[in-house]
A protein has these predicted regions:
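Active-site gating loops and adjacent loop-to-helix segments of metal-dependent hydrolytic enzymes
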Residues: 46, 53, 132-166, 260, ...
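Divalent metal-dependent hydrolysis catalytic cores, especially in the metallo-beta-lactamase
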Residues: 126, 145-164, 173-196, 219-225, ...
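N-terminal secretory signal peptides
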Residues: 1-71
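Mid-to-C-terminal alpha-helical segments outside catalytic/metal-binding sites
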Residues: 71-88, 111-113, 138, 152-174, ...
């Protein structure tokens, strides 16, 4: 397989890609993935011994409960009780990291009662994706192997392996039918080759207008992508301000997400970027979302000359010089784990409190005296939660305690990963262990799933960033309960719609059997 034959979205080397399998073909369809899944931007670690234990327990417990409820294992695992079963299994292996009651797993009504507790919670997903209808690059099919119904109607059955899984119908199903997401921010990515753009700036705004018109409420907001150093890039900024009116900007300081780019740049480049900040602030579009972290194992070689642009060494000065500008750092700048043993990362944190690149971000507010830098959790919450929940709690806890609970925002990087519901449930249930709190001298716990801290992370922080009236959120959520998307969801569930539990992307081969049950 040559590099040109590798699927789009894969920045791993040919050898590294050959060490992977498509997740939905080989991975056990658990409500929570039982090994790290990668979207192709970073190397998935092999399934750890603890993850194998979790998988064994989920199967064992699910078989028992499914039989008792006269269901198949797959049917049971698609229920709220099945989700609870997965968290119980994780707690048995990792210690009590997630708040879950055994009654949820055994009693469908008890699981339903817990689900009702979260009805109406405002959840704003700060990072979501789909592709344009005329996208022709079939290489994108390598990013996932999805074979569930792509329409709102769950009876549509299996669909061919085509790009339709990445398009709006499936996006609406995964984001709004199969999860508790209330509002989604639609994003995109620039590429040196314009043929690879997933969505143009016009397509992003057209999609948002279409969905909001159909819903009868504001369910989607959109980015405009900026491309510093491209010829005449500021002309597109002017057009976006005048015609498109996005809620925020999006870009990659590394230039191209999947390889060395001639357009890498820095946030603190005074000549290049400061005129843009001035223009953005004047237009009232004063939030920019920047991809940081999330690099492949061989990033120093694969992104030679540009990888340092994926760190946060350009954030502090820019934020200090432009206090009216908000800088949302995607993936919380976390450098993916490079070792095959994830406990090595936790061991480093236990030793010195440092998490690669993410801690550098968390220290910026105090170091530079700024309050306009935010950490977003897309992809990195998912990968750490399923690989080492204790590390995940430390990672999120450090962001919350060093940056403040007002400066951490929820994002999932869906639809690449399928439905974000398991991520939402993991965040609702996650807590920082007391020994970590004491050793680090932290004061802020994550708290209840509908408590102050998690409500801020899930949606209220983004509501402020994107100029949604926080005081009207409660009333808006009530309207969301009765808009067209809510009606579609009610019909979908009434017809038997359920999560597929399909994990998308890539997993490490590590000798496992192909399995889908």
């Amino acid at each position: 397989m040559t590099d040109k034959q590798r699927p789009f979205g894969v920045s791993m080397t040919e050898r590294e890609f050959d060490e992977c399998l498509h997740a939905d073909e080989a991975a056990f369809r658990s409500p929570i993935p039982t090994q790290m899944v990668s979207n192709g931007e970073y190397n998935p670690l092999p399934q750890t011994p603890k993850q194998k234990q979790v998988e064994f327990l989920i199967k064992e417990m699910a078989d028992k409960e499914a039989k008792r409820h006269n269901m198949s294992r797959r049917q049971f695992l698609a229920t709220s009780s099945g989700m609870a079963t997965a968290f119980l299994a994780m707690n048995q292996v990792y210690g009590k990291m997630f708040e879950v009651d055994e009654a949820e797993a055994k009693n469908l009504d008890a699981a339903g009662d817990r689900k009702a507790k979260y009805k109406g919670q405002f959840i704003f997903d700060d990072q979501t994706h789909f592709i344009r209808d005329d996208f022709k690059e079939e290489g994108l099919l390598g990013l996932t192997k999805w074979a569930e119904g792509a329409k709102v109607n769950p009876n549509i059955g299996n669909i061919p392996t085509t790009l339709s899984r990445y398009k709006m119908d499936n996006y609406l199903k995964e984001i709004f039918m199969d999860s508790d997401t209330t509002v989604a921010l639609l994003s995109g990515a620039p590429f040196d080759d314009p043929n690879w753009w997933l969505l143009s700036n016009d397509a992003i705004q057209n999609a948002c207008r279409s969905v909001n018109k159909m819903a009868g409420s504001v369910r989607m907001l959109g980015h405009s992508i900026i491309t510093p150093k491209y010829p005449n890039w500021m002309d597109e900024v002017d057009r976006a301000i005048t015609e498109l009116k996005p809620v925020s900007w999006k870009s990659y300081t590394i230039g191209d997400p999947f390889g060395p780019s001639k357009y890498a740049w820095r946030l603190d480049d005074e000549k290049l970027m400061y005129p843009f900040y001035e223009k953005a602030i004047k237009a009232g579009i004063n939030t920019i979302c920047i991809h940081k972290g999330l690099m492949p194992r061989d990033y120093e070689k694969a992104f030679a000359g540009t990888w340092e642009n994926a760190t946060v060494n350009d954030v502090g000065k820019a934020a200090k010089d432009w206090p009216q500008m908000n800088f949302v750092i995607y993936h919380a700048a976390l450098r993916p784990w490079l070792a095959d043993k994830p406990d090595m990362e936790m061991a480093q944190f236990e030793k010195d409190g440092y998490i690669q690149w993410s801690t550098d971000l968390a220290r910026i507010p105090e170091k530079f005296g700024v309050n306009n830098v935010y950490a977003e959790l897309g992809s990195v919450f998912a990968s750490t939660a399923v690989t080492d929940p204790r590390f995940c709690s430390a990672f999120v806890g450090q962001l919350v305690n060093l940056m403040g609970p007002d400066r951490v925002v929820w994002g999932t990087d869906s639809v690449w990963y399928g439905s974000p519901q398991w991520q939402i449930e993991a965040m609702r249930r996650l807590e920082i262990p007391d020994d970590i709190m004491k050793k680090q001298g932290w004061k802020i716990k994550l708290g209840d799933g509908r408590g102050t801290v998690k409500n801020k992370i899930f949606g209220l922080n983004s509501a402020k960033l994107y100029k949604l009236d926080a005081q009207k959120i409660a009333a808006d959520v009530k309207s969301f309960d009765h808009d067209m998307i809510a009606k579609m969801k009610a019909e979908y569930l009434a017809m038997g719609g359920e999560r597929s539990n399909a994990a998308y992307g890539y997993i490490a081969k590590d000798g496992r059997e192909f399995e889908q049950g």
